[in-house]
Amino acid sequence: MPIREIRHPLIRHKLGLMRRADISTKNFRELAQEVGALLTYEATKDLPLESYEIPGWCGPVQVEKIAGKKITVVPILRAGIGMLEGVLSLIPGAKVSAVGVARNEETLQAHTYLEKLVPEIDERLAMIIDPMLATGSSMVATIDLLKKAGCRDIRAMVLVAAPEGIAAVEQAHPDVTIYTASIDQKLNEHGYIIPGLGDAGDKIFGTKQKDS
């Protein structure tokens, strides 16, 4: 499984701002969208193109457009919603599927409680978005669901990834590429990424925050 850590200066700068303990909900939310957009740029660099002709100001002009499969963006609820607007700013024509996954705070295992997939999803490139790849259980559960629905071209974008989560996805789904802004050090005993961002969902939605 390719894991691609995107160390672009803009991403590094914005991620550094997101790590502040005293960051406001507004700023965290805006930065999550911005980094999500930058990751989308990298995750779509290899999409195929095809030429076609349009009427230009001086006559017919050959231009290019994205060819091949259509795209569905798959936010893992709820935190994945925090990256959605940034992703759609670059691919506004993409359809949105949604997968709700809850993690048991004691066992750290995930279970799926909601799936709203677009029609003919098996014919689309599925791009999963979730701010944190911690234990990997939510990501694995989502990929399991998408593959069961017929998806064969799946990519994932996360703001921060832990080595444990990367290993879990690699073991279960070695064909899925993960794009991340940072590979962090480890998980703590509560399954939170160190140094991480804290609870990304709480910070995006302004609910009670937990320690990272």
Curated annotation (Swiss-Prot):
Keywords linked to the UniProt accession: Allosteric enzyme, Glycosyltransferase, GTP-binding, Magnesium, Nucleotide-binding, Transferase
Alphabetical GO biological process terms: UMP salvage; uracil salvage
Residues annotated as binding 5-phospho-alpha-D-ribose 1-diphosphate: 78, 103, 130-138, 199
Similarity comment text for this entry: Belongs to the UPRTase family.
Cofactor requirements of the protein: Mg(2+)
Encoding gene (name): upp
Coiled coil start-end: none
Sites where the protein binds uracil: 193, 198-200
Species, as recorded: Pseudomonas fluorescens (strain ATCC BAA-477 / NRRL B-23932 / Pf-5)
Pfam families reported for this sequence: UPRTase
Regulation: Allosterically activated by GTP.
GO molecular function annotation: GTP binding; magnesium ion binding; uracil phosphoribosyltransferase activity
UniProt cofactor note: Binds 1 Mg(2+) ion per subunit. The magnesium is bound as Mg-PRPP.
CDD domains per UniProt: PRTases_typeI
Reactions that this protein is recorded to catalyse: UMP + diphosphate = 5-phospho-alpha-D-ribose 1-diphosphate + uracil
Main EC class the enzyme belongs to: transferase
Pathway it works in: Pyrimidine metabolism; UMP biosynthesis via salvage pathway; UMP from uracil: step 1/1
Function noted in UniProt: Catalyzes the conversion of uracil and 5-phospho-alpha-D-ribose 1-diphosphate (PRPP) to UMP and diphosphate.
Full protein name: Uracil phosphoribosyltransferase
Documented EC number(s): 2.4.2.9
Record InterPro entries: PRibTrfase_dom (IPR000836), PRTase-like (IPR029057), Upp_B (IPR034332), UPRTase/APRTase (IPR050054), Ura_phspho_trans (IPR005765)
SUPFAM superfamilies in the cross-refs: PRTase-like
Spans traversing the lipid bilayer: none
